[in-house]
């Protein structure tokens, strides 16, 4: 364990380097004032002989080591220790614990003798440094995993800023079809080559007699000059030996130049004259890239894009590299034992670490985060091997579904009902859901971090239709107990017939149940005997042989959704595991709590009124002034100080699941429990769901863009995915305003139904036919227009090798698949699609959603989903692109592999097996978030809300530092924080910091969530806003263009939130004096707005108002008068003649009509004045922050939102606000700020709702 911990710590230490070097100057000054950061010098054995390093007193010595290893001047050192005052410093102590170490102290770097492991690590590191390491082939992370496109887009932006050429939106087609090139990496120039190869020599491993002499490894290096050197890795360093390919003589070779060095890097620089120059060129090329785009992943699994460059393209070309297959040996030694870890022991000892001080908590959470990341990766790798049949089962005689496996100290089983545990709940379907819910339950318990309660490391992996559970092995779980003893110590034993209780489990389960709002309740075994349990009978407690208390099977921490199961007139749901979500229970608890507090306050007020009346007479002469203020503050305190200890809400998770109470009292209690659960279910249906629909209807929150963002939004609100159908019905009833939502909901149901159908076929298909199966099913769903009767493309010679394989997928036709999808949609979501639903599919978006749900990576080319899109006179199997005949020239990947082109007689289909390049596993993990980092962030937010700006910013920077230390830089949580922080800096007018953080948010979001995720679009839109606020408008437009291109791929045109973006673009174009282009974007925005909100809505009037001004600036005075009249008429009919919006429009209309001749000059003057003012405070320019999905957008400037009266200003001044003060105008969100900065929007909610 000690060794593993050391390794963990060592590999984690890379993040602080980023911290100390990568932060903004404000943070550094902040820390220096706190005395946290100081500089020390490091004395080196070779050139440059001394370097300066910035360190923090809280850092560990190994963090300093890591900083040294990553500095260009000290790359070559990997095997060394540090000394101070002649004494060796322990790597695992903090710098503050090193006696006498202070600013400007000198520590000495001393080179150590190598061990075999150190030598292997050195070779790996040097290969990476000199660019000799090819891409590792990886069965977990797919092609182009962790891709970021930011660099190529910012290059385009930089080119636009420096040249005087037209801006990036000048010829942009807003309604154009999507280009798949948007999400593909650009082909890059090859990096400078420093050496031809560095590999292990065929003379490995070292013979015994030479191990005694300190030989560790034998290497072979071929320099750029073509010379081959055989090199011995020795305890003292590296030297050229006398071996040849045929003769073994591993002793030093006399050399004209220096033939030995402690570091391999130094040795190669002696041997190859061109090495130093080419190595410098390589570093220069790498430095052009943003560090974050190449930084290796440590605490997260990188995102694998669904669309990748074809195998034939230069981006994914497969290069020869002899060492690629040797890397496993270099990483983990001869017997691979170095990577075997006792996962369970590591998890539990980490959980037992002290958590008394902040330092303790940082260390503990950092270790936890790294451990979970390592485990999730190892478990996912093993699960892939199990799914492929590469691991031998422990019980080979059992049925496939009942087989269990152990690989890399992780226990695997299938998420299927192999032994009949869930027979009464729905069999395999129930088992599949149960393991998914179990991970969610374990994640919740890990987050609570209850002292003395332990969970096994758990991961669920979906791969090739199979669901596989990987768990760390709990000591004692396989132990056969004595006769009469139960296998389980607490909870139901193998079903609910036998129930075990154990006094030791009561205190820890009590804490758990209190936190998860679970009620202590009675259950009865098969003999009718009562047992009082703290949790659900399904949740089990096991006393491990290590003496720890483990909680298992957490799939029932919330009650069943009783109303769903009892719904009249519905098809039977596939299983009985439909439970409520934890978020809903929490939301219901808050709802009941607020009712309790209100009732309590009312009761107090009533009591106070009586008390005050009696006191008034006796104290009439007391100081009346003070009394008034005191009474107010007391009343406020009274409201704040409502004692909630009297309030409790806990739900019984076992109601309606077959328990039979025995006595009348028990029956009465049970009925009460059931009533509470039914009220919770009703709360979901009557309050939560209608509120979500209303919020999206009113435009109060950001709108989902694809299946992923929709699911996240529902889950955040506590709504289960099974309610997609109900939501679609509610959304339909709201009419045209929510067409976009209905479309997304229906598309999500179809994609999920297809996923279930595809999985049922894939589960039994032999590996070589997987691509054929998927391609055929996709053709039946998406390619029926191209070929109404597609045939599965199966290699006949391969088929003969698998006589018993399942080829039932061949029989699927478009008609049978549609019927199957309708059946799934009906039973799973209780929704009936429109009769001709398959004719209105958005093919590209559905293909993307399905690919993400199944883990597909498709080759990029122009897919044809209609006959009209098929290319003329091209081998038909090649297909062509989604609605994009026009854009053919753009795709680099219409690549015809020889195999495809060779059989032109095949009928055309949309997708061929060769298009499915790879399938990646989908991992559901139980990693907890860092509570420490979240506490700091919350404290910072509260301080800012209380106007303590200095303290708030310090706390938020502290939270940023904790996030980066605990999660590493590349992690979705860190991306989220960068995003929030950039917004905060934007609001406090610190533009440079906002841009810097927004840029980081873009890159980390791209690499962890995907280059075309909804979060990535939002990150790009915010970055464009902040760039514009900093005066880089051309750059901002490049980012907007990229975001719009992404939007076309993931949603299509006319997304409700795109109104905000189009208005932002229009305002930016006005800023560049591109009046005619600006007008186009306002017109596009108006089109979407009218389609969503109707011609007579206030939102439409607001855009008409802005458009009229844009027309005036574009010297179209006649058009301007017409649009302003339309705006005036809408304001008049909706808000009445006295409303300030109506009056303002009227004044403008008069002016525009009177001055029709001189209008152009008038508008130009105003524009010039507006620009002068903008330069003073660009932030109120009228661009608007894009809200995140499901959240309302923050008001962009704290101060202005508090000032509601702008009435007295002149038209000239108001132009600034009107022309873009609320550029989103489609949304009535951000009411506060809109009312302040744009009087036209006042009162819009009631009229537009």
From Swiss-Prot:
Keywords per UniProt: Cytoplasm, Repeat, TPR repeat
MF annotations from Gene Ontology: mRNA binding
Region (Disordered): 1-34, 610-638, 874-907, 1178-1249
Single GO biological process annotation from the record: mitochondrion organization
Matching SUPFAM superfamilies: Hypothetical protein c14orf129, hspc210 (SSF103107), TPR-like (SSF48452)
Localization per Swiss-Prot or TrEMBL: Cytoplasm
Positions with biased composition (Low complexity): 1192-1205
Gene3D superfamilies (alphabetical): Tetratricopeptide repeat domain (1.25.40.10)
Compositionally biased region (Basic and acidic residues): 613-638
Superkingdom assignment: Eukaryota
InterPro entries in the record: CLU-central, CLU_dom, CLU_N, CLU_prot, GSKIP_dom_sf, TPR-like_helical_dom_sf, TPR_rpt
CDD domains for the chain: CLU-central (cd15466)
Domain (Clu) ranges: 321-565
GO CC terms: cytoplasm
Family: Belongs to the CLU family.
Subunit structure comment from the entry: May associate with the eukaryotic translation initiation factor 3 (eIF-3) complex.
Name of the protein this chain belongs to: Clustered mitochondria protein homolog
Organism classification: Eukaryota, Fungi, Dikarya, Ascomycota, Pezizomycotina
